[in-house]
Amino acid sequence: MGLKEYKFGFESENIAVKFLKSHGYEILERNFHSRFGEIDIIAKKDEILHFIEVKATSKNYETAYRITSYKFSKILKTIKFYITKKQNETDFQVDFIGINKEKISFIENISL
């Protein structure tokens, strides 16, 4: 990934964080890494952990289509690792934020 793509991704995640905070989410972690993968944002709202995948584009296509079953399985493995590491047994869900030319789409509790 080049510097331009890195900056675009970082700024997109900043937009997502501002969106989540404005909707009452507490941001716990950003870019949580494990050997299985990465979670872009981990947040909490109403005692539920939210593991949020952020995808952004400046082109005309639907960002949600970029989450494949392979990517989703990596997200789930990383969630298991996070919960085990933090010894935090609580309800959780996987959410998605898509950013397309300043338009934000928020899809809660996704599954494949």
Curated annotation (Swiss-Prot):
Belongs to the UPF0102 family. This is UPF0102 protein CHAB381_0216. Pfam families: UPF0102. GO terms for molecular function: nucleic acid binding. It comes from the Bacteria. InterPro entries: Restrct_endonuc-II-like, tRNA_endonuc-like_dom_sf, UPF0102_YraN-like.
